[in-house]
Regions:
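Conserved beta-strand cores of small sensory beta-sandwich domains that regulate signal transduction
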Residues: 51-53, 95-96, 104, 161, ...
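Conserved helix-loop-beta segment at the catalytic/binding core of cyclic-nucleotide signaling proteins
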Residues: 80-113, 128-142
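Short beta-strand-to-loop capping motifs
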Residues: 57, 105-110, 164-165
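Conserved long alpha-helical elements within nucleotide-processing catalytic cores of c-di-GMP signaling
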Residues: 23-24, 29-41, 47-51, 58-84, ...
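Alpha-helix-centered segments that form part of catalytic cores
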Residues: 146-162
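Regulatory sensory/coupling modules that transmit signals to nucleotide-handling catalytic cores
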Residues: 1-17, 179-180, 196-204
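A common structural junction motif
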Residues: 123-127
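Catalytic/regulatory signature loops of cyclic-dinucleotide turnover enzymes
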Residues: 128, 158-159, 164-202
Length: 204
């Protein structure tokens, strides 16, 4: 590579660095934290018209304990692809990855519920390929006794916390707070919850 080519490479690199939307996560191809923060700055003042969703692949750790890590990347990529292609059906829908198993969606409030439900249905169908027939029939990945009580851990699913109205938190804390609510949601049978101020206060 000569000087001219090297200079062109650096110019292209710097152009991309000026726009965080061009910094995709290697595993998923989705925009990562810099792009999420930039988009959050646009969406947060418009909560109500726009919604922000925090989506997690629930019960993936029990799956990895039982079945091993061989298909770990494949599961993450399928979740990302399902969320991305589902949300592409409407204008101005943003999908990014905030951590290994967690994603952020931002779009108009009128579209969010439909996106989330459709993505959940598609993912539920897709994960059938990762479990044994026995686990699918029982809808349980792991089962064990804790303090004399039988604990059954279900199959992987997408769970979502949605912020669609102003909540009593700063923009800089919103994603952190949504992630914390998502952790609590994972211990329930619910797939979707709309975030409120009581949920934020409970965890602080």
């Amino acid at each position: 590579m000569g000087t001219a080519e090297a200079r062109k490479y650096i110019q292209e690199l710097r152009r991309k660095q000026e726009n965080p939307y061009l910094w995709p996560d290697f595993l998923t191809g989705l925009p990562d934290k810099p792009a999420i923060l930039k988009k959050l700055g646009e969406a947060f003042p418009k909560l109500g018209k726009y919604s922000i969703a925090y989506v997690r692949i629930a019960n993936i750790h029990p799956y990895l304990i039982k079945y091993g890590p061989d298909r770990h990347a494949d599961i993450i990529q399928w979740a990302a692809a399902i969320l991305k292609t589902t949300c592409e059906k409407c204008r101005n829908c943003f999908v990014g990855t905030v951590s290994t198993h967690d994603f952020i969606i931002m779009c108009e409030s009128k579209d969010m519920g439909g996106h989330i439900r459709e993505a959940g249905r598609i993912f539920k169908k897709r994960i059938e390929a990762y479990y044994s027939k026995e686990d699918l029939q029982k809808k349980t990945a792991l089962s064990f006794i804790r303090n004399g009580e039988r604990i059954n851990v279900g199959l992987m699913r997408l769970i979502t916390v949605i912020a669609d109205n102003k909540v009593h938190t700063e923009k800089s804390r919103l994603i952190h707070d949504m992630g914390r609510v998502c952790e609590a949601l994972e211990t329930t049978d619910d797939d979707i919850v709309v975030m409120n101020n009581a949920m934020i206060c409970k965890g602080r």
